[in-house]
């Protein structure tokens, strides 16, 4: 082990053994999982070394700015290092990626092998971010990752797989395409599987692809499943994919973190634009995500804010993959400080320092509300979330408060101060309407070109919102 710490990974190629056949989906689910919650556990560990992480990876954690393990890391990592299958239930921004990446990398160092680990994620952006985390944490040991997602060239991906990476990070649809069609590609010797954002994977109808992948993977493996919630579908996936797992939890079903200041603002629907601009000026200089419910509204709000001089960029599922990654890159680097987004940005994206979340359009359910406001107040930092409640949203807002089991305070503003900007905002809205006409025409042309209907397997990891 000590020798491995001082050199890069020199791996053996996995042997191709036709006797290593895939299990059936139901064969691993006979044992019940144990349960332990954060309330039963001691305080989080003070260091990764205390959890059993080796010095080389501890140093990588320091380089990434991980000062101390988060609660989910403190609970999950020791169990994973013991060789247990783990189910991790934790809120967005709790450090789930490192909770499965560190044990996987440590095991890779102890027994170097190509095609060692597989991580399944629901969206293309999340897959790239997980891969980046693996490569950064494993940089001193020469870890190689391949990202296999829809919308990219199959041949180039086949070449990347042919180079035998240590870790594959993939969305289920495209991975299954390669397992079924790419000559010479096999995961029969895979040692580790991590399923991230499991509830989101199943919400996006990846269930059939997951079922097929799990049947193909070897029976003898370590599996980690991480999810924000434990739904009936996730329970079924757990029974199908994990063997005698232990469950760790640091959040309840509908819970926001204590460092989050959540409030609402009650306004007439016709003045939503005005109040948004007023609040953005109130929080000037801070990074913000503005959530909307439709692609059209995302683009319109972004156009309007740009006309007013704000550094706003849109993010939604109808942008090209390169445009989406470009938008995220600009927002992370703070060259743009306002992201206008559909719920494509509510889960799993690596945006570590969002100061404010605005629910410009209310989500229709409490679960989505939790995921949206989870973009701020992450990893112990404070954050603000303000929801716009118009005369049409009262019933939805009351349902959200009921699910949270608390009444949230109203954010107070002076109406006269808000109305000062009315003429400028009205003009910016008119400009946005003109730009939207051009946007809708282009979108219509794309629809005629490519046709409509049920999404293909290749497009399932690109959210429609």
Curated annotation (Swiss-Prot):
PROSITE patterns referenced in this protein's UniProt entry, alphabetically: HELICASE_ATP_BIND_1, HELICASE_CTER, Q_MOTIF
Residues annotated as domain Helicase C-terminal: 275-419
Superkingdom to which the source organism belongs: Eukaryota
Alphabetical UniProt keywords: ATP-binding, Helicase, Hydrolase, Nucleotide-binding, Nucleus, Ribosome biogenesis, RNA-binding, rRNA processing
Coiled-coil segments on the chain, per record: none
Motif extent (Q motif): 46-74
Stated name of the protein: ATP-dependent rRNA helicase rrp3
Species per Swiss-Prot/TrEMBL record: Emericella nidulans (strain FGSC A4 / ATCC 38163 / CBS 112.46 / NRRL 194 / M139) (Aspergillus nidulans)
Encoding gene, per UniProt annotation: rrp3
């Amino acid at each position: 082990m000590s020798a491995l710490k001082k050199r890069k990974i020199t791996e053996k190629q996995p042997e191709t053994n036709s006797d290593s056949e895939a299990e059936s989906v139901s064969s691993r689910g006979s044992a019940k999982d144990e349960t332990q919650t954060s309330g039963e556990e001691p305080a989080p560990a003070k260091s990764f070394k205390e959890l059993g992480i080796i010095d080389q990876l501890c140093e990588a954690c320091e380089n990434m700015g991980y000062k101390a393990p988060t609660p989910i890391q403190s609970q999950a990592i020791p169990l994973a290092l013991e060789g247990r299958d783990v189910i991790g239930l934790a809120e967005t921004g709790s450090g789930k990626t490192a909770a499965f990446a560190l044990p996987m990398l440590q095991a890779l160092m102890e027994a170097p092998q190509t095609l060692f680990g597989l991580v399944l994620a629901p969206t293309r952006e999340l897959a790239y971010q997980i891969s980046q985390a693996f490569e950064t944490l494993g940089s001193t040991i020469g870890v190689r990752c391949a990202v296999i997602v829809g919308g990219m060239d199959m041949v180039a991906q086949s070449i990347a797989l042919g180079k035998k990476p240590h870790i594959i990070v993939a969305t289920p649809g495209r991975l299954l395409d390669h397992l079924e069609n790419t000559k010479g590609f096999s995961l029969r010797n895979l040692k580790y599987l991590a399923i991230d954002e499991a509830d989101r994977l199943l919400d996006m109808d990846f269930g059939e692809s997951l079922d097929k992948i799990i049947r193909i993977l070897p029976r003898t493996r370590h599996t980690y499943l991480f999810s924000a919630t434990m739904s009936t579908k996730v329970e079924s996936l757990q029974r199908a994919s994990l063997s005698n797992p232990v469950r760790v939890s640091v959040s309840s079903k509908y819970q926001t973190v204590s460092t989050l200041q959540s409030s609402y603002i009650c306004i007439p629907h016709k003045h939503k634009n005005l109040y948004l601009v007023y609040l953005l000026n109130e929080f000037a200089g801070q990074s913000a995500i503005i959530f909307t419910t439709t692609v059209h509204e995302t683009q319109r709000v972004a156009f309007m804010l740009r006309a007013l001089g704000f550094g706003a960029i849109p993010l939604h599922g109808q942008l090209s993959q390169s445009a989406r990654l470009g938008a995220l890159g600009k927002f992370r680097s703070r060259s743009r400080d306002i992201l206008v987004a559909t719920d494509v940005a509510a889960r799993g994206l690596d945006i570590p320092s969002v100061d404010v979340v605005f629910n410009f359009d209310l989500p229709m359910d409490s679960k989505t509300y939790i995921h949206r406001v989870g973009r701020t107040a992450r990893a112990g930092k404070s954050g603000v979330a303000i929801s716009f409640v118009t005369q049409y949203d009262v019933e939805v807002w009351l349902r959200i408060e009921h699910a949270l089991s608390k009444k949230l305070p109203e954010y107070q503003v002076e109406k006269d101060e808000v109305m000062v900007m009315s003429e400028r905002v009205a003009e910016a809205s008119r400009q946005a309407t003109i730009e939207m006409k051009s946007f809708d025409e282009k979108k219509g042309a794309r629809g005629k070109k490519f046709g409509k209907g049920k999404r293909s397997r290749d497009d399932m990891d690109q959210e429609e919102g």
